[in-house]
């Protein structure tokens, strides 16, 4: 059976791709939000089609009718294609397997349905929308609390795919996802813990969720515990989650209070780039700087990064040292004694603009501290 063709009206005039978030410009034409936003962000102030001059701050009005049409068409196509082949399950049947109250599906049936829904959700934003509107999310969240690790893992992966859309990130938090995910983070098998940490990262990509997640009981504490006790992938995902969450000011202090600093220093010493990035955020708060100042090996680990680290790690290490030296003459003198000024003078000539700029900033900080001494 041939793949159904989407009507041309469903395609964005800029990207020529099927629109996932159609919006109407004041000229009356509809575009995909991401495409027209990039057009406007580039400084364009005319309609791409009519060349009509737009207001200083153009409004983008959601085209709910067209979005619904595209969603229905996409879902119908998925269903019809599924029915045409015995290998392809019907999406509506998969959803019904999860939400039907008149029967209790077997464990195998639940896992199968979740895995198939995962496959569909991963590549189809309209199916993700349909699934969230079906009422199945609450059932999937219940599966996250399952004692069966296979069911828990499949449910976490489905939530992760649903969270690809920003609207769903907010909606999942409203549905109570944080508590379920943190429970999996605390008590799940290693693979489930890694997925749970990744899920928190995804939810925290929306600014409004960062404070909510950070303030949730055991959230930051459990991520720090995973840094301390987890293995490779679990530690990496926990560090990434902390990196995203700690861009929110209150979460920096929470991470420090939960004991993240010495663990991060140990991870930096073992070569994990994400750990030095988290340290870069913690060094922006007083509590983080004070904690780093108490740890004897902190400065030496950072100096070692300057000598042997990746470009990204060097950029972060320079920023951390600059923050520490700006607030502590004692650390500034220690850093100078250990030859950092000479290292920075060399790095100031680096071809990487960020390394050069950060090195120059640290040189200026060290010289200011010397003049005050």
Model-predicted regions and their roles:
Residues 90, 135-139, 168, 176-180, ...:
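Structural recognition of alpha-solenoid helical scaffolds
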Residues 77, 124, 166, 207, ...:
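Long alpha-helical scaffolds in large eukaryotic adaptor/regulatory proteins
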Residues 138, 146-147, 170, 179, ...:
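Tandem repeat domain/solenoid detector
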Residues 14, 18, 35, 49, ...:
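Acidic, Ser/Thr-rich intrinsically disordered and amphipathic helical segments
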């Amino acid at each position: 059976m041939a793949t159904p063709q989407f009507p041309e009206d469903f395609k964005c005039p800029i990207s020529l791709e099927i629109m996932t978030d159609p919006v109407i410009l004041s000229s009356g034409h509809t575009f995909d939000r991401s495409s027209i936003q990039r057009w406007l962000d580039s400084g364009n102030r005319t309609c791409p089609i009519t060349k009509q001059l737009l207001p200083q701050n153009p409004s983008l009005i959601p085209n709910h009718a067209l979005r619904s049409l595209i969603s229905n068409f996409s879902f119908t196509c998925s269903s019809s294609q599924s029915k045409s082949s015995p290998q392809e399950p019907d999406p509506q049947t998969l959803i019904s397997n999860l939400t039907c109250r008149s029967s209790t599906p077997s464990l195998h049936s639940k896992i199968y349905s979740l895995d198939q829904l995962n496959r569909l959700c991963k590549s189809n934003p309209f199916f993700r929308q349909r699934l969230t509107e079906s009422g199945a999310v609450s059932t999937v969240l219940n599966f996250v609390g399952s004692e069966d690790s296979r069911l828990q893992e499949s449910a976490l992966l489905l939530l992760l795919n649903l969270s690809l859309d920003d609207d769903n990130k907010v909606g999942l938090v409203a549905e109570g996802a944080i508590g379920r995910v943190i429970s999996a983070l605390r008590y799940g098998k290693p693979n489930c813990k890694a997925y749970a940490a990744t899920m928190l990262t995804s939810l925290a990509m929306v600014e409004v969720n960062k404070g909510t997640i950070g303030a949730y009981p055991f959230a930051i504490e459990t991520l720090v515990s995973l840094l301390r006790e987890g293995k490779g992938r679990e530690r990496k995902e926990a560090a990434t989650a902390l990196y995203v969450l700690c861009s929110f000011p209150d979460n920096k202090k929470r991470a420090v209070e939960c004991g993240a600093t010495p663990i991060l220093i140990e991870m930096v010493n073992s070569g994990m780039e994400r750990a030095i990035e988290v340290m870069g955020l913690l060094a922006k708060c007083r509590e983080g700087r004070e904690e780093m100042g108490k740890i004897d090996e902190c400065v030496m680990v950072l100096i070692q990064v300057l000598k042997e680290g990746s470009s990204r790690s060097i950029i972060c290490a320079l920023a951390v040292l600059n923050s520490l030296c700006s607030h502590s003459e004692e650390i500034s003198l220690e850093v100078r004694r250990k030859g950092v000024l000479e290292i920075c003078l060399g790095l100031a000539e680096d071809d990487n603009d960020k390394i050069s700029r950060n090195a120059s900033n640290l040189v200026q900080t060290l010289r200011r501290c010397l003049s005050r001494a």
